[in-house]
């Protein structure tokens, strides 16, 4: 038996007035996800434990069976695992645009990987402290490493949570480390405009010390592989001892290389027992707050990812679990911690006929703790 986990990041949503009171998932034409729901069994999953922010890090770790209450240290350190970066403290470091004290773009104008690398090189040339170092990632998603002993109880805010809001109310807080971060942010605001017109400030957040995750193969007795468009999931996979499969031409947006993602997923499924395909585009559109574009993004995912994979895998010998990690409602343009709809193909059927937030609530699994999902997928 093969196991395929499909995670369309941020797909779940709320009812939207401009969509006649329906969710983007309800409006979108999704015959392939509907097939999985009709031929499988459904439920809703709590992927964000109480007391945690609804980040993709927490939610995806939970889906993969990792108890974040024991193993989570921050988003930055997980992304560092993806790049082989080590340090005492690691922060995710966005390139952002701020105007008149307001966060207007958390993604640095979707800066290209190449331009972002040049920006990071210049930041390292001009950095004010030797114990500070920047590492380039993908597009606006970069890292800040601080190799000095600080208490790591600083409070930071994800920039995608404060789009359109004043940054003064959301700056780092919590002692000496917070003061350093604010100093670096102010310093970057002075030099970034000389380097690029896409971003005018760095925004460090999600920092912590390097984590230790349970080994996937040892725990489940399966050879696992991860295909993803973002460093975060690559870091989770590497931290769990899973193979990471690279795909050329991916963008983390709705213009991504769908064909390459499908090809490499199908190939990985031939060589491994368990494969995760995590895509980012739907979540990005949710952060933009565009309901119609989110409908389109979901339809692209259904036709170009799910539909193509259904034609490539042996459905008699493959179990498929499909769910977003968290909702990203277009109304609020950020993540929320509500349960997400899931469908599990290959473990019996229920009465659900379509894959939506509402229909999955009527599924036979009901409300499930996200930590149970892996057992539901792979148990005999």
Curated annotation (Swiss-Prot):
GO molecular function, one term: metal ion binding
InterPro entries with a match to the protein in the record: Alkaline_phosphatase_core_sf, ApgAM_prokaryotes, Metalloenzyme, Pglycerate_mutase_ApgM
Gene Ontology biological-process annotations: glycolytic process
E.C. no: 5.4.2.12
Keywords: Glycolysis, Isomerase
Involved pathway(s): Carbohydrate degradation; glycolysis; pyruvate from D-glyceraldehyde 3-phosphate: step 3/5
HAMAP family per UniProt: ApgM_A
UniProt function note: Catalyzes the interconversion of 2-phosphoglycerate and 3-phosphoglycerate.
Family, per entry: Belongs to the BPG-independent phosphoglycerate mutase family. A-PGAM subfamily.
NCBIfam families: apgM, hyp_Hser_kinase, PRK04200.1
Protein name: 2,3-bisphosphoglycerate-independent phosphoglycerate mutase 2
């Amino acid at each position: 038996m093969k196991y395929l986990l499909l995670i369309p990041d941020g797909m779940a949503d709320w009812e939207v007035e401009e969509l006649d009171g329906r969710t983007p998932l309800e409006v979108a034409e999704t015959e392939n996800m509907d097939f999985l729901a009709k031929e499988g069994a459904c439920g809703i999953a709590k992927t964000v434990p109480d007391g945690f922010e609804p980040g993709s890090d927490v939610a995806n770790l939970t889906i993969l069976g990792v108890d974040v209450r024991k193993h989570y240290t921050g988003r930055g350190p997980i992304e560092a695992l993806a790049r082989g970066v080590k340090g005492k403290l690691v922060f995710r470091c966005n390139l952002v645009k701020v105007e008149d004290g307001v966060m207007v773009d958390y993604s640095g104008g979707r800066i290209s990987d190449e331009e972002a690398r040049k920006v990071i090189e210049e930041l390292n040339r001009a950095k004010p402290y030797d114990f500070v170092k920047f590492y380039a990632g993908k597009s606006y998603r970069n890292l800040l490493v601080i190799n000095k002993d600080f208490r790591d109880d600083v409070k930071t805010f994800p920039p995608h949570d404060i789009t359109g809001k004043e940054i003064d109310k959301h700056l780092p807080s919590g002692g000496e480390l917070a003061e350093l971060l604010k100093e670096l942010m102010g310093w970057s605001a002075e030099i970034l405009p000389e380097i690029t017109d896409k971003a005018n400030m760095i925004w460090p957040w999600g920092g912590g010390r390097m984590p230790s995750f349970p080994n996937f193969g040892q725990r489940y007795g399966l050879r696992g592989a991860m295909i993803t468009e973002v460093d975060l999931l690559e870091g989770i996979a590497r931290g769990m001892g899973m193979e990471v499969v690279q795909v050329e031409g991916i963008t983390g947006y709705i213009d991504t290389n769908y064909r390459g993602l499908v090809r490499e997923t199908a190939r990985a499924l031939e060589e491994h027992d368990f494969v995760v395909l995590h895509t980012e585009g739907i979540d990005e559109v949710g952060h933009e707050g565009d309901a119609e574009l989110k409908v389109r993004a979901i339809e692209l995912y259904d036709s170009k990812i799910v539909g193509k994979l259904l034609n490539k895998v042996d459905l008699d010998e493959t179990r498929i679990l499909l769910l977003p990690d968290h909702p990203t409602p277009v109304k609020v343009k950020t993540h929320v911690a509500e349960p997400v709809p899931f469908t599990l193909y290959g473990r019996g059927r229920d009465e659900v006929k379509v894959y939506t937030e509402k229909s999955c609530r009527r599924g036979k699994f009901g409300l499930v703790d996200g930590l149970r999902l892996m057992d539901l997928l792979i148990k005999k």
